[in-house]
Curated annotation (Swiss-Prot):
GO molecular function: serine-type peptidase activity
Single GO cellular component term: membrane
Summary of the function given for this chain in its UniProt record: May participate in wall plasticization and/or intussusception or in cell wall turnover.
Keyword list, A-Z: Cell wall, Glycoprotein, Hydrolase, Membrane, Protease, Secreted, Serine protease, Signal
This protein's name: Wall-associated proteinase
Main location: secreted
EC number per UniProt: 3.4.21.-
Any one of the GO BP annotations: proteolysis
UniProt membrane topology term: Peripheral membrane protein
Compartments in which it is found: Secreted, Cell wall; Membrane
Organism listed in the record: Coccidioides immitis (strain RS) (Valley fever fungus)
Main EC class the enzyme belongs to: hydrolase
Glycan attachment residues as annotated in the record: N190, N295
Length: 309
């Protein structure tokens, strides 16, 4: 029986794509990004199956641009003890390795970043076989995913959340997490060097704090500014700013975000830069039940020199 089908032009400017939706042989929604110039090739949709069950909560979801399309990743659970990394929008599909096996995770953390072209990188936590220490895992997702890369150097806590950003001048990624210290400092790791580096001034971070990172890249100076937001032990929204050059980040002083409402203790956090002038943060304030927006205007005072603590 022929599949239902519909198509529209990708609204992203200059994408040069048609978005073709249809049903697979398993009667699940598929999406192919077909070039408007039909002589160009395309990648056929591969159906890895739908995870019967729910999107895990508490957990994390992460969105990134890939091939001019917004893709949302999540952790799904098919009613057993196993949890899988999945695409949950614009289609719903398990992510599989090259052996067509779904990618498992035991934890709630998930982050993603993009080169704004064909590559997404998805980060999650797992226990490497035979070890008691959680590690950061990286999936490079193009038209399909590769085998996970394990970052063996960093030692994230099992309840850590993750944030990830892409540095286009070096084609590097920076991943941020909380460590297994008695005080849960935040750390960063570079995808090339893979060694953990403590962020001074973040010793007040709440255990299992949500993390959000936004960026502004300066192509001329080959540098990038990272705005990292987290919850402290008093449930206040904190900000710390880092300047990326080459493989290093120079961090400035952490600050409580002025005027931001206290955070609900189990809220997650996300943010986006608006016109290079302010960061729009979304989180659930204490005593509320819905995500609210808070605008944090970028100021010179963000770049005070760092201090220990």
């Amino acid at each position: 029986m022929a599949s239902p089908v519909t198509v529209l032009e990708n609204p992203i400017p200059k994408s040069g794509q048609h978005l073709l939706f249809f049903l697979t042989s398993k009667q699940q929604l598929a999406l192919e990004q077909r070039p408007i110039e039909s002589s160009l090739g395309y990648s056929a949709y591969v159906d890895h199956g739908v995870s019967q069950g729910v999107i895990v909560n508490p957990s994390s979801i992460a969105a990134a641009m890939r091939s001019s399309l917004v893709t949302v990743y999540g952790i799904t659970k098919p009613g057993t003890d196993k949890q899988y990394i999945s695409v949950i929008s614009p289609t719903y599909n398990l992510i599989a390795n090259r052996q067509n096996q779904p990618i498992e995770t035991t934890q709630k953390a998930l982050a993603a970043c993009s080169d704004n072209d064909r590559n997404n990188w998805v980060y999650y936590l797992n226990l490497p076989q035979g070890t008691p220490q959680y590690a950061i895992y990286e999936l490079n997702i193009q038209d399909s995913s590769s085998a996970p890369t394990v970052y063996s150097g960093p030692t994230p806590s099992g309840n850590s959340n993750l944030a990830a950003v892409y540095f286009s001048p070096n084609k590097d990624r920076f991943i941020i997490f909380s460590n297994t210290d008695t005080r849960h400092y935040l750390y960063w790791v570079n995808s090339t060097l893979q060694s953990a580096n403590r962020i001074s001034g973040t010793g007040s971070v709440m255990s299992a704090s949500p993390l959000a990172a936004t960026t502004i890249t300066n192509v001329q100076t080959r540098s990038m500014t990272i705005f990292l937001y987290y919850m402290d032990v008093n449930t206040l929204l904190n900000r710390i700013v880092g300047k990326v050059t080459d493989n290093e980040i120079h961090w400035y002083a952490n600050q409580v975000v002025e005027g931001a409402p206290p955070m609900k203790v189990d809220t997650l956090l996300t943010g986006v830069v608006v016109e290079g002038k302010w960061n729009c943060l979304y989180y659930i304030p204490d005593g509320d039940t819905e995500f609210r927006a808070f605008n944090d205007t970028i100021r010179d005072s963000f770049f005070d020199e760092p201090r220990e603590g």
